[in-house]
């Protein structure tokens, strides 16, 4: 009703952008005739106009004025370099991002191209722009692909990758536009704030940031803080004993209807993801371990047992992690990708290693940490884009102060979303999924089946194999993950069946009829590999084979031989002239680059460069480009015909096999079908055994099914059921939002402390007025000593001046001649002023002694001792704050707000830490005795 009265707020926003789009389109007439050099020179003109405006605060309104011209320049450059012209809706997306909002743009609408608009405009300030993606591959792809537009216009483009050295990182962060992943940005920020010297700092001050897949980073990953840790030794036997104990304990059944707790050793709360020992469990554990108290601080066991129970019940092999090379490797619950190098903290990973009888790695201690929420709030201007943001609109607004605008699609959506089907049992559900896949496959339509775990994907694979349906399997197993983009690029071909674990998070579009461009690049790689790649470059996986009934696996092939590619992967045989062209190209490239002289990565990068449209003077890249065009041309003829057949048959059909806890992730999976106005359809198959229904309200549905005596293989389709499911999802979303909100509120306390510590550290690294800073520490320490030993309410003759003078001498041994008589008769303020003057004199004397050894040594010592104390005490403080956070939770039972308790006590602990830091620095500076330089004779 409100929307009818006031109008759609999203439509009102979009209406505001229409005149600016018209301005950009009018400018196109002036921009198009310009030569490349004239177009490039416009960047310098725009920069000069910004420079004249002065500081950043004054530049923002000027940026808004420059927007139509800047966007028009980028659109023209993109047309020339990439052969892609921004649609009007993409211009709107660019404006939404420039204004610091979230642009919701559906799959296939060209979000990557949209980011070039605000990143160019904001890079004109010279203060740097960060474009953030979810993985290294996408960061590299976008930097190479979209970076061509920026480089063409005279801007520098940087890329941050996981294995880069600090000097490379510094160089890339100094560029006008830098592409990076969220984790690399966050870890570099933490490392910069642990640097021992300013030369080790790689980032510069943050300015403007555009996040691709913003919901994945700011929502899905918001519960997990970024942590840099160091190893600490713990007793490995305890993990093993706890794992054995957990295996012997019995889980309690659900709470009885009469409220009586059923028998069992421990209870599991899947909603809270926690395990709790019952009284019987405590007794059994203490007896088995031969201890009297599991919580004994001298010999603690409770933490180990809780983690072992969670490893047993809540961390499932091939769902939450896989075992590879005798290691437990985490599987990302949102993307289905493995995350090598990542470990669960707080001893949980060690508990899983003990459960799987793997070698137990040392536990870690936090050295520095920050949540993504507080990290991205460090940017003065933040924006993001995704296909699915509206369901999380409230959280974006409340946590990040980011509004969400839905950008209309360029073409009207033609996708059909069929009603969910719910089955009584999982067995019946999976049989139905296999049957629908077979039916759609027979119609020569491509099918994409999304599963939630490796185990489920392999179950479906075996069911399809029984029906002789050829299919590709894409999950976190190492043998499947290597060729992800090849599988996805061909998932739109007629009759293709692809099973993907957590497809929602994968960045490659599915093109109906197949991706001829990718196939052409693959063919070039196959032809050139055996001639150009060095033999010792290691084994290569072979490529997916789609004509067998089993899931396409990958076997190793020697690097000296082209990978074995099934002929069915390519749409047709190449003509004789094209084959000859490729053979001649191979000979020419061997002459230019050497016989088997490249690595696989080198070859792939050169083919990728040739496949783009950027201008190049490199003769070999030009030859490669011509060859790709020839091969693509032949494939295109077949692919276009196949695309027409797939369209007529109904397009891609997407099957979801379980509702995710978040509606947004379901929408991402649905969004794979019907991109850019293509036809397509989607359906979800569910069962009462699915996690969402089981944990959040399946009893009601089960009751309905039993009441109507529904057969196992008989599905239910009803609007009431769908609404019930969406209600359950909203419950889960609210539950997780509350968790993220709590994480944010608690980390906000740490964030204020972190900022204070890091700004103090940065001042020291910059070497700004170090002596003044240390003397300031000393003066405050003198004041604290006076306040500790002098009571202003007592007469001066009762003040304990002996103790006071003794304490001053403990800190400053150079004042050993100071006596109580010298301070007798002074008032409190006079006493403080006298001691501060004594401190300054003593410090000057100390500086003279130290700098006699080597000029400038005193400044080096100041920097060293301040950083040493900050880092040591901050590390201890992080541990203490973690312990405090765990303990304040129990105070809720005493009618106290745990968050307020945490804030108050945390603040007191922080003040104590800063006081200790100042005192330790003063003590260390006066005790510092550098070794005398040795006689060189």
Curated annotation (Swiss-Prot):
It catalyses: ATP + H2O + cellular proteinSide 1 = ADP + phosphate + cellular proteinSide 2. It is a peripheral membrane protein. It is an enzyme of class 7 (translocase). ATP binds at residues 90, 108-112, 509. One of its GO terms (molecular function) is ATP binding. InterPro entries: Helicase_ATP-bd, P-loop_NTPase, SecA, SecA_CS, SecA_DEAD, SecA_motor_DEAD, SecA_preprotein_X-link_dom, SecA_SF2_C. It is found in: Cell inner membrane; Cellular thylakoid membrane; Cytoplasm. Its EC number is 7.4.2.8. SUPFAM superfamilies: Helical scaffold and wing domains of SecA (SSF81886), P-loop containing nucleoside triphosphate hydrolases (SSF52540), Pre-protein crosslinking domain of SecA (SSF81767). GO terms for cellular component: cell envelope Sec protein transport complex; cytosol; plasma membrane-derived thylakoid membrane. Transmembrane segments: none annotated. One of its GO terms (biological process) is intracellular protein transmembrane transport. Keywords: ATP-binding, Cell inner membrane, Cell membrane, Cytoplasm, Membrane, Nucleotide-binding, Protein transport, Thylakoid, Translocase, Translocation, Transport. It holds the Pfam family SecA_DEAD. Belongs to the SecA family. PANTHER family: CHLOROPLAST PROTEIN-TRANSPORTING ATPASE, SECA INNER MEMBRANE COMPONENT OF SEC PROTEIN SECRETION SYSTEM. Monomer and homodimer. Part of the essential Sec protein translocation apparatus which comprises SecA, SecYEG and auxiliary proteins SecDF. Other proteins may also be involved. Part of the Sec protein translocase complex. Interacts with the SecYEG preprotein conducting channel. Has a central role in coupling the hydrolysis of ATP to the transfer of proteins into and across the cell membrane, serving as an ATP-driven molecular motor driving the stepwise translocation of polypeptide chains across the membrane. This is Protein translocase subunit SecA.
């Amino acid at each position: 009703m409100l929307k009818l009265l006031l109008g759609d707020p999203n439509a009102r926003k979009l209406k505001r952008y229409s005149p600016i789009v018209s301005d950009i389109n009018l400018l196109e007439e002036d921009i198009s005739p310009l030569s490349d050099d004239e177009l490039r020179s416009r960047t310098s003109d725009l920069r000069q106009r910004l420079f004249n405006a002065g500081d950043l605060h004054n530049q923002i309104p000027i940026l808004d004025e420059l927007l139509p011209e800047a966007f028009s320049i980028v659109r023209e450059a993109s047309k020339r370099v990439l052969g892609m012209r921004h649609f009007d809706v993409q211009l709107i997306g660019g404006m939404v991002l420039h204004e610091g909002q979230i642009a919701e743009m559906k799959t296939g609408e060209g979000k990557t191209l949209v980011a070039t608009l605000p990143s160019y405009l904001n890079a004109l300030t010279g203060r740097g722009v960060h474009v953030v993606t979810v993985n290294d591959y996408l960061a590299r792809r976008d930097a190479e692909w979209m970076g061509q537009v920026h480089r063409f216009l005279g801007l520098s483009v940087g890329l941050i990758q996981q294995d880069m050295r600090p000097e490379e990182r510094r160089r890339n962060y100094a560029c006008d536009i830098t592409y990076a992943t969220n984790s690399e940005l966050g870890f570099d920020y933490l490392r910069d704030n642990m640097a021992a010297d300013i030369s080790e700092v790689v980032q510069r001050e943050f300015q403007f940031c555009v996040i691709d897949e913003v919901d994945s980073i700011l929502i899905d990953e918001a519960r997990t803080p970024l942590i840099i840790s160091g190893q600490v030794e713990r007793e490995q036997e305890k993990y093993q004993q706890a794992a054995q104990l957990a295996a012997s304990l019995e889980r309690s059944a659900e709470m009885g209807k009469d409220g009586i707790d059923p028998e069992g050793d421990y209870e599991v709360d899947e909603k809270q993801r926690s395990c709790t020992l019952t009284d019987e469990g405590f007794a059994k554990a203490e007896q088995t371990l031969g201890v009297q108290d599991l919580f004994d601080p001298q010999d603690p066991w409770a933490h180990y047992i809780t983690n072992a129970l969670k490893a047993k019940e809540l961390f499932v092999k091939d769902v939450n992690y896989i075992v590879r090379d005798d290691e437990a490797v985490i599987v990302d619950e949102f993307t289905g990708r493995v995350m090598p190098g990542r470990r669960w903290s707080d001893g949980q990973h060690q508990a899983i290693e003990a459960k799987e009888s793997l070698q137990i790695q040392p536990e870690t201690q936090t050295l520095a940490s920050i949540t993504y929420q507080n990290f991205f709030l460090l940017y003065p201007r933040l924006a993001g884009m995704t296909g699915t943001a509206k369901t999380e609109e409230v959280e974006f607004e409340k946590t990040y102060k980011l509004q969400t605008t839905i950008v209309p699609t360029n073409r009207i959506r033609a996708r059909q979303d069929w009603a969910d089907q719910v089955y009584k049992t999982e067995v019946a559900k999976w049989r139905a999924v296999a049957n629908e896949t077979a039916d759609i496959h027979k119609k020569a339509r491509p099918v994409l089946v999304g599963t939630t775990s490796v185990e489920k994907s392999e179950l479906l694979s075996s069911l399809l194999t029984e029906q002789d349906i050829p299919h590709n399997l894409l999950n976190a197993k190492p043998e499947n993950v290597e060729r992800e983009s090849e599988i996805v690029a061909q998932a739109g071909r007629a009759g293709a069946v692809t099973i993907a674990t957590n497809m929602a998070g994968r960045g490659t579009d599915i093109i109906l009829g197949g991706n001829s461009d990718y196939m052409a690049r693959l063919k070039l790689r196959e032809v050139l590999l055996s001639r150009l790649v060095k033999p010792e470059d290691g084994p290569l996986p072979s490529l997916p084979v789609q004509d067998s009934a089993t899931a396409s696996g990958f076997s190793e092939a020697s690097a000296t031989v082209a990978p074995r590619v099934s002929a069915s992967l390519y749409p047709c045989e190449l003509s004789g002239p094209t084959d000859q062209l490729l053979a001649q190209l191979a000979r020419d490239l061997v002459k230019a680059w050497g016989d088997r002289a490249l690595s696989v990565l080198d070859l792939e990068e050169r083919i990728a460069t040739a496949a783009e449209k950027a201008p190049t003077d490199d003769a070999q890249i030009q030859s490669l480009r011509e060859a790709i065009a020839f091969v693509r041309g032949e494939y295109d003829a077949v692919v276009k015909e196949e695309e027409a057949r797939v369209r007529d048959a109904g397009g891609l059909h997407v099957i979801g096999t379980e509702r995710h806890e978040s509606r947004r992730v379901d929408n991402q999976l649905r969004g794979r079908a019907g991109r850019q106005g293509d036809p397509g359809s989607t359906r979800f198959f569910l069962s009462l055994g699915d996690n969402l229904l089981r944990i959040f309200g399946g009893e009601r549905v089960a009751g309905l099914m039993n009441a109507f005596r529904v057969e196992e293989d008989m599905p239910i389709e009803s609007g009431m059921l769908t609404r019930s499911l969406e209600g359950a999802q909203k419950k889960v979303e609210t539950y997780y939002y509350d968790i993220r909100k709590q994480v944010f509120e608690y980390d906000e306390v740490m964030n204020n402390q972190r900022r204070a510590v890091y700004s103090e550290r940065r001042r020291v690294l910059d070497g700004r007025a170090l002596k003044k800073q240390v003397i300031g520490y000393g003066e405050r320490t003198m004041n604290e000593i006076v306040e500790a030993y002098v009571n202003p309410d007592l007469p001066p003759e009762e003040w304990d001046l002996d103790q006071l003078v003794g304490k001053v001498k403990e800190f400053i041994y150079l004042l050993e001649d100071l006596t109580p008589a010298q301070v007798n008769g002074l008032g409190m303020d006079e006493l403080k002023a006298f001691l501060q003057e004594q401190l300054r004199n003593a410090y000057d004397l100390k500086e003279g002694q130290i700098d006699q050894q080597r000029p400038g040594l005193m400044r080096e010592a100041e920097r060293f001792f301040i950083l040493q104390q900050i880092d040591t005490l901050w590390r201890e403080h992080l541990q203490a704050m973690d312990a405090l956070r765990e303990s304040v939770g129990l105070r809720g039972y005493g009618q106290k707000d745990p968050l307020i308790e945490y804030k108050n006590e945390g603040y007191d602990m922080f003040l104590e830490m800063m006081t200790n830091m100042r005192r330790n620095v003063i003590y260390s500076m006066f005790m510092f005795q550098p070794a005398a330089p040795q006689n060189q004779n």
